[in-house]
């Protein structure tokens, strides 16, 4: 079994590195899917983390990232991430996932499934990421939010 230098003070096998990354991703998504941004962001994002999300300016730091997710989560009843695959490098994790959203006040509770790719700027042994970049097309979710809002309008 080969070993990779994945952190300045930690040498792990590829299998151990992937297991640690997978567990971190599961913990990250469980916390995020709770739709409670404060503990999620402060636990998994470094205080100076930069987040790039489609259609948004670069968000910097806990305050901006929490504010973004608070706005987004007000439109949701639920969010569930399913990891499809991931790859680890010494300083980042690449992940493919499907995110299933249910829009708040949708009488049908129809899940909106959106595939996406994310890059997490963290090394093995690091608990918080320094950057988070998301690639996905949120337009099906935005369309559903608009249609539910229009149906509720007097």
Give residue ranges: language-model regions:
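Low-complexity proline/serine/threonine-rich segments in eukaryotic and viral proteins
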Residues: 1-2, 61
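Exposed alpha-helical structural elements
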Residues: 20, 40, 64, 140, ...
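A beta-strand edge to alpha-helix "cap/lid" segment located at domain peripheries
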Residues: 2-15, 70-154
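Hydrophobic alpha-helical core bundles mediating ligand binding, dimerization, or RNAP-core interactions
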Residues: 25-32, 45, 65, 69, ...
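Short, mixed-charge, low-aromatic patches
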Residues: 19-29, 53-55, 73-78, 130
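A solvent-exposed, acidic/Ser-Thr-rich amphipathic alpha-helical stretch
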Residues: 38-92
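Short acidic-aromatic low-complexity motifs
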Residues: 11-47
